[in-house]
């Protein structure tokens, strides 16, 4: 089956030329990475935001610039299930994801393998039918990688610590046997005043950089940080640590208020790499 885009023309442009122009303008944006060369050796995974490109695209480009020389065969993308449809944790098989930049194959072999290795992951295409969290990452990946790659999409309704440990370990098992990049799709604080969002997210980013998952969940709960993809970030932290990463590095943090000027109610965006 072809998984048609559900937010093309909304979160990002719906035509190839406009989308390519938009991604380039995000790179050159004052909050984007620009053309500087980044040292991207030894990166195991990244965190990237998933809002409309006009808001979070410049920050997302930091994550993608950091992995742009990698050319992986497989990109494992984990993100939250905003609509709560389908299974608690789901991947899919026998599918392609369509964007204005073309089709990307799902790695069905990897999907079956990870579903066997995990207590949580099930194969269910319906879970992926409405959500944008994985979709918005794919055009960015298509634009930076010159070689063909496959994806392993994993969407999370359950974002518990127990799930993250199970799924993180299962992701690492897949990554060990393939040339793989891992992406966690998440925004940070939602709909708070700008300075409060900055302080909340600074507190949550600290344990991410330390790759301390238990502390991450403690801060998340104690401060009630409204990061939507916390389970995706935790799973990727666990997977990357399993693969040999020792720390996270913050590449960029912005809010929609920083980018657009309305600071009364903002969403936070972080670009982080695990090395």
From Swiss-Prot:
CDD domains linked to this entry: MEMO_like (cd07361)
SUPFAM superfamilies: LigB-like (SSF53213)
Cited Pfam families: Memo
Listed InterPro entries: MEMO1_fam
Family matches, as NCBIfam families: AmmeMemoSam_B (TIGR04336), PRK00782.1 (NF001987)
Homology family: Belongs to the MEMO1 family.
HAMAP family registered for this protein in UniProt: MEMO1 (MF_00055)
Name under which the protein is recorded: MEMO1 family protein Nmar_0215
Organism placement in taxonomy: Archaea, Nitrososphaerota, Nitrososphaeria, Nitrosopumilales, Nitrosopumilaceae
């Amino acid at each position: 089956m072809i998984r048609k885009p559900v937010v093309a023309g909304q979160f990002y442009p719906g035509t190839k030329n406009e989308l390519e122009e938009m991604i380039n303008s995000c790179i050159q944006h004052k909050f984007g990475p620009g053309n500087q060369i980044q040292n991207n050796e030894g990166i195991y995974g990244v965190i990237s935001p998933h809002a409309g490109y006009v808001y979070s695209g410049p920050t997302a480009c930091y994550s993608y610039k950091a992995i742009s020389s990698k050319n992986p065969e497989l990109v494992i993308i984990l993100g939250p299930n905003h609509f709560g449809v389908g299974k608690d944790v789901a991947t899919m098989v026998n599918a392609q994801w369509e964007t204005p930049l073309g089709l990307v194959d799902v790695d069905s072999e990897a999907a079956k393998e990870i579903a066997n290795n995990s207590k949580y992951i099930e194969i269910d295409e319906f879970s992926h039918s409405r959500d944008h969290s994985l979709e918005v990452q794919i055009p960015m990946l298509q634009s930076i990688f010159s070689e063909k790659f496959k994806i392993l999409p994993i969407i999370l309704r359950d974002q518990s610590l127990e799930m993250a440990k199970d799924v993180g370990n299962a992701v690492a098992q897949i990554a060990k046997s393939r040339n793989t990049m891992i992406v966690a799709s998440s925004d940070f604080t939602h709909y708070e005043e700008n300075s409060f969002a900055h302080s909340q997210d600074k507190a949550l980013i600290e344990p991410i950089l330390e790759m301390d998952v238990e502390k991450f969940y403690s801060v998340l709960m104690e401060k009630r940080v409204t990061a939507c993809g916390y389970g995706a970030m935790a799973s990727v932290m666990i997977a990357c640590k399993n693969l040999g990463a020792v720390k996270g590095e913050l590449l960029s943090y912005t809010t929609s208020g920083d980018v657009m000027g309305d600071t009364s109610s903002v969403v936070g965006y972080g670009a982080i790499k695990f090395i």
